[in-house]
Amino acid sequence: MDWWKTAVMIVGIGLTLTACGGAVASGGNGSPDQSGCTVKGAGTASPALTSNVIPDPNTLGRFVPNNMTVKVGQAIEWNWQDPTVPHSVTSDDGTTFDSCLQNKGYKFIVTFTQAGSIPYRCTIHPSMVGTITVTK
């Protein structure tokens, strides 16, 4: 395949994924973590809500709260407080936002730009789930 066809295809895929997202990247370094994961959707806005990523012996972790509602333009911050194992905050589509696996002390802020419902999870703990509802 010619290089220009490949370039056009990559740009098209990028535009498609951008149009489908409900969050905007307004900060963060976008660098890969140790597993090769690249943080997506990280921002620096003042959060309207905060959720804590905490230990739970029954489920290997929890988001508290796990279901949150914000308005378009508002941000949510997740704070890692579990000293025992890493966790991620990852939209189910894997592209809207992804903190990658992080340890205690990490903070992740996402600003939501489109109304809708965005389910999210920890990529290695199936019982750690939540939903962000974004209203106009």
Ranges and model annotations:
Residues 2-136:
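Extracytoplasmic copper-binding redox domains, predominantly the cupredoxin/blue-copper superfamily
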